[in-house]
Amino acid sequence: MTVLGRSYRTYALDFWGFGESGKKRSTYAVQDFVSLVDQFMEQLGILRAPLVGHSMGGTVSLSVAIQYPHRVSKVVVVGSPIVGSSLALPLKLAGYRWIAYLLFNNMRLFRWGLRQASPLICRDPRFPDMMDRDLSRTTLESFLTSIASLRRTDLRPSLPSVRVPVMGMYGDRDNIVHPRQWETLKKGVPHAEIHRFPRAGHFPMLEEHQTFVEVLKDFLDKPEVML
């Protein structure tokens, strides 16, 4: 965001139940986050803008383009599941209440385990601390509901309705979301641009930062068109 902020006005939106956003809601489903983006733009008077989302954020961004096409000029998805079944098995299991409950009631052990596994997820040395910080700002309900909802998501039937420029950015070594989800995106949105990062996993913005920023900025700088 620092680099893009030199050329664009940028906003980082924390979904309900995550980061600095409110934690007192009855549901944290993908559809709730789609509505949140629409409401956020309405409140700030943003008529139309490019949306860039990582992981579930990209799934939400693409869903906004489908449900609120007047809001979106471009979409960039980064390591995002188009179909929820593409999530790694441990993540899908974490969407079940009893497993999520065990994890959150053994949070210290859970965080320790993730720290040990972090080199397998992302090579950037900053990643363990970033992950630990994010976990500390997440509730059991938001984690459980969002993962369970994402697991059931399937955008394939709606993809042909997307008429704005789309780019998918995927790491070939992703072990959180199946790295070939770019194929699903390309099949549903034939005009989508795809950029693959051979040496990156689920976090290409960290592992191949310079290339990531250059590719993203090049896409955003292109003239807006309706397809």
Briefly describe each language-model feature range.
Residues 5-52, 214:
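Active-site loop/oxyanion-hole signature of alpha/beta-hydrolase fold enzymes
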Residues 164, 178-187:
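Short alpha-helix in the alpha/beta-hydrolase fold that links the catalytic acid
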Residues 162, 168-170, 174:
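Short beta-strand/loop motif that positions the catalytic acidic residue
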Residues 62-67, 73-104:
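Flexible "cap/lid" loop of the alpha/beta hydrolase fold
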Residues 53, 57, 61:
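Gly/Ala-rich beta-loop-alpha elbow adjacent to hydrolase catalytic centers
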Residues 86-91, 105-161:
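Conserved alpha/beta-hydrolase catalytic His-Asp/Glu region
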Residues 192-227:
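Catalytic active-site module of serine/aspartate enzymes centered on a nucleophile-bearing elbow/loop
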Residues 15-19, 82, 201-204:
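Alpha/beta-hydrolase active-site loop signature
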